[in-house]
């Protein structure tokens, strides 16, 4: 079995399972549908449940994905990532520092950082992030504080300056993913494109096929 950091580098598609967005699908059921596809990353993001509920959800997903090709990331909660031996944690701009997360989780775990401009991306890389997400590329209701999105030009700049894996994120779907790829992104992260799809697996396969042919 390859290390999860190796799988991170091979992954093209990053699925964010947000309980608020996936209102019609249980996270575990959704993960069980998609986990046997190409190497990918799944992040559990739940900002509405109490911590006990979140731990139960995360444990179920961790158990389902154990020994799979899927990298399992927990959003925000370093302590839950440590408790459940998740593959890593994703931190936003206001969360605990990357250095604290690294000290708690160790060098073998994956730490990702949300970035909205090139300076943030460079800082995250220099501080030892394993990957970054950069966005939102397009307008998305999930990021109302950046109503216009960051645009495709920033993807081009990140492509030229960032050496660690980066995932373009924000409003990306099958109708605009080729524009993102043409701007220099080899990897994308999506939420609504999978969580709100009528059938998650075909939707995932379609996006994955587009990414892997480029």
Residue spans for each PLM region:
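Conserved N-terminal beta1-alpha1 strand-loop-helix module at the mouth
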Residues: 1-98, 102-131, 147-150, 157, ...
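A short acidic, helix-capping loop that chelates divalent metal ions and anchors anionic groups
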Residues: 81, 138-144
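Hydrophobic alpha-helix-in-membranes signature
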Residues: 135-138, 164
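C-terminal binding/interaction regions
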Residues: 183
């Amino acid at each position: 079995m390859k290390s999860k950091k190796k799988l991170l580098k091979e992954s093209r598609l990053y699925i964010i399972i947000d309980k608020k967005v996936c209102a019609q699908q249980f996270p575990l059921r959704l993960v069980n549908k998609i986990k046997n596809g190409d190497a990918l990353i799944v992040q559990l993001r739940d900002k509405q449940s109490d911590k006990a509920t979140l731990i139960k959800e995360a444990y179920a997903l961790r158990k389902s994905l154990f020994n799979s090709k899927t990298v399992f990331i927990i959003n925000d909660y370093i302590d839950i990532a440590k408790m459940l031996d998740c593959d890593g944690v994703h931190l936003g701009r206001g969360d605990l520092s990357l250095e604290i997360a690294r000290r708690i989780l160790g060098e073998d775990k994956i730490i990702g950082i949300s970035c909205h401009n090139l300076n943030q991306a460079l800082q995250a890389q220099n501080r030892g992030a394993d990957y970054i997400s950069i966005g939102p590329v397009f307008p998305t209701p999930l990021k109302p504080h950046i109503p216009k999105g960051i645009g495709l030009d920033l993807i081009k700049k990140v492509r030229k300056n960032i050496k660690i894996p980066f995932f373009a994120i924000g409003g990306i779907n099958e109708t605009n993913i080729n524009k993102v790829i043409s701007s220099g992104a080899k990897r994308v992260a999506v939420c609504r494109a999978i969580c709100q799809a009528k059938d998650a697996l075909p939707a995932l396969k379609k996006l994955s096929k587009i990414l892997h042919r480029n």
